[in-house]
């Protein structure tokens, strides 16, 4: 059975059995809950950090996928750059408003594999998370 634990640094959704591991950097509560619920349904373990320091700390869990909200208030581009200094192999998917083309270019330059408009990210969230199970 699934459980969700909350504290001031991370939200962790877990489910018994074999799981993919996902780490996310986002401070938007709506997206945190959507991510946790979708992950729970798919049997994917998700750890969500609300700041760059907690995000980098969660990387010790060896995630298969990293998700970044480029509109997070905690310098997400810097967090991606820092991540890429040590982890070049992990897939990084970021999302933002479709009009933020300059921010999208910065994210790609920082090391994002994919940068999606928020609407596309939401629409394809189940498929994005399912890829972490492979």
Spell out what each predicted region is.
Residues 50-65:
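Acidic, metal-coordinating helix/loop segments flanking the phosphotransfer/catalytic sites
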Residues 20-28:
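Conserved acidic segment of CheY-like receiver
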Residues 111-123:
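Output/docking surface of receiver
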């Amino acid at each position: 059975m699934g459980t969700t634990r909350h504290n001031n640094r991370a939200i962790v959704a877990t489910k018994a059995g074999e799981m993919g591991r996902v780490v996310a950097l986002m401070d938007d509560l709506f997206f945190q809950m959507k991510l946790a619920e979708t992950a729970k349904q798919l049997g994917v373990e998700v750890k969500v950090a609300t700041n760059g320091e907690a995000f980098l700390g969660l990387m010790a869990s060896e995630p298969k996928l990293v998700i970044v909200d480029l509109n997070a208030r905690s310098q997400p581009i810097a967090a991606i750059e820092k991540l890429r200094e040590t982890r070049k192999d992990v897939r990084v998917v970021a999302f933002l408003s479709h009009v933020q083309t300059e921010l999208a270019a910065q994210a790609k330059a920082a090391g994002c594999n994919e940068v999606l408009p928020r609407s596309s990210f939401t629409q394809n969230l189940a498929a994005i998370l399912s890829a972490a199970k492979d």
